[in-house]
Structures are given as C-alpha cells and as structure tokens.
C-alpha cells in the first residue's frame, strides 16, 4: 500500500496535484482543499496517502497532515459516506473543525457541506463521536494555513476555484455566488489558494 509520497509538485489543478518522485514516477493525488492550498508548484512536498480501489479506477487521496488522513479513513468506514463525500467534508472544514463540531453536536455545521442533509448529519454525529474521540488533531489553529502559489490571470483563478467547488458537490450557481461574495469588498486575489479560502468561508454565512 502507498502510504507516503515525497517529491516535486509538477501540476496543480484543484483538487488534484501531480507529484513526481525521485524515481521519475508521477502520482496524481486528490486532496481536500486545505491540504491542496499548502502545495506550491515546482516545490518539494510530502503527502500522506490513502490508496482507494474501485471497480473502474485506482485512486490516491492525499493529506499534508497524517491525522487528517486518519479522520478520512474513519469517515469512509461509515455506511453511505464514500471517498468523494469524505473529501468534501474535509474541504469544507479542517479535521480539527470537524472533530469540534462532532463534539459539540453541531448539526447545522454539517448540513453546510454539499450532499449532507439533516438526517445524514444526525447520523454522522452519532457515528463519528466514537470514531474520532481517540484521534488527536491540531487545535492550535482551526483555519488552515495558506502558502500561496502565484497565478497571474484572475479569470483563470476564478475558473479553477469554481471547478474545484463543483467537483466537491457544490452547484455552479452556489459556487459563483460564493466567489462573488468573496470578491464583493473589492479585494483582489493573486492566487487560487487565497480565493479558495475566502470562498469556502462564504459558505459559512449562507445557511
């Protein structure tokens, strides 16, 4: 099983990164947005991975923090929660935030995640309580750290953010609305990562 990949980041298109190891092999890895936002093109990265096998594909999911991978693995053990939903959950909030919301039994916080309704949120709160209690996550900063990778064209940045949100289950209109709200105060974004962070924060105020 592939558990950790270290190498140079060759390609970034949210939520996928391609990392080439010293052996010359490039691995396509799907990451939750907080982890994706910490990668920088052409720089070295070490990514904890989960190898996921389906009938039609073999996929790698990656995480900067090993504990985040531990949370992902607990999520996909729950009936009805596939890898895509688990990735969406860890994109909408950090592992620390998810654990906090579960401990506080915050149903509203979970229903903000695409694809999770009230009944699903209630079930997740019950099942995750025991699954996450023994996982120690970093609570020192509940907002993920951003190390921006410079991208020049604003239209390209917006298109990439919109595509990333839609791939995680948000509707096109929802993605566009959140991006518009993030830019409403006149702030400009020089990189994809900072706009992603600002846009994700907007979803917290929509519900």
UniProtKB/Swiss-Prot annotation:
The ranges of region (Domain I) come to 1-64
Give me the Gene Ontology terms describing cellular component: cytoplasm; Holliday junction helicase complex; Holliday junction resolvase complex
A Pfam family that the UniProt record links to this protein: RuvA_N
Gene name?
Answer: ruvA
Q: Which residue ranges does the record annotate as region Flexible linker? A: 144-152
Oligomer and partners: Homotetramer. Forms an RuvA(8)-RuvB(12)-Holliday junction (HJ) complex. HJ DNA is sandwiched between 2 RuvA tetramers; dsDNA enters through RuvA and exits via RuvB. An RuvB hexamer assembles on each DNA strand where it exits the tetramer. Each RuvB hexamer is contacted by two RuvA subunits (via domain III) on 2 adjacent RuvB subunits; this complex drives branch migration. In the full resolvosome a probable DNA-RuvA(4)-RuvB(12)-RuvC(2) complex forms which resolves the HJ.
* A GO BP annotation: DNA recombination
Keyword DNA damage set for record: yes
Specify where the region named Domain III lies, as residue ranges: 153-207
Recorded hits in InterPro entries, A to Z, give: DNA_helicase_Holl-junc_RuvA_I, Hlx-hairpin-Hlx_DNA-bd_motif, NA-bd_OB-fold, RuvA, RuvA_2-like, RuvA_C, RuvA_C_sf
- Residue ranges for the region (Domain II) are 65-143
- Name recorded for this polypeptide: Holliday junction branch migration complex subunit RuvA
Q: How are the domains described in the entry?
A: Has three domains with a flexible linker between the domains II and III and assumes an 'L' shape. Domain III is highly mobile and contacts RuvB.
- Keywords in UniProt for this one? Cytoplasm, DNA damage, DNA recombination, DNA repair, DNA-binding
In which organism is this protein found? Psychrobacter arcticus (strain DSM 17307 / VKM B-2377 / 273-4)
| Segments traversing the membrane | none
Domain of life (superkingdom): Bacteria
